[in-house]
Amino acid sequence: MDFCAGWGGAAVAAAALNIPKYVGIEINHDLKEPYQRLSAFLKNKGTTTEIDMRFQDALTVDYSTLQYDLVFTSTPYYFIQKYKNNREYEGGKKEMDDQFYKPLFRKTYEHLQKGGHYILNVNQEVYERVCIELLGSANDIYTYKKSKRQNEYQEMVYVWRK
């Protein structure tokens, strides 16, 4: 389950591995038609993955109706990335922590199946300000270097086992 689906990288990865079902949640309704094309393309290539996309605010989803044993997502990094249809947090990082990250992480972790994995690609500040308080220290931490052009810049992927 990917509650900040973005441009579809995780959907493609799930399809490449023939994961039985990928549930993506994306607030940007403009991506609905591109996702339909992507799903058709992946089916045409032979994937057996069912891609279930929901175009809505991730905070409004009733996660108790979904069955998932894996969360793998990359959330917005405070105000570094601007996404269409995302609300603005006039109160700064604390407001975004309290009104976006904390309720979203709480809801999605609560309904993760026991024994499942909760995997977040977030910046270190979100990890330290929000994740440790809600989820405790990650069981595993991996470096995720996105590009060779960015030299020493690297992000982290944090993994919790429920």
Q: Where are these predicted regions, by residue range?
A:
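Class I S-adenosyl-L-methionine-dependent methyltransferase catalytic core
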Residues: M1-K162
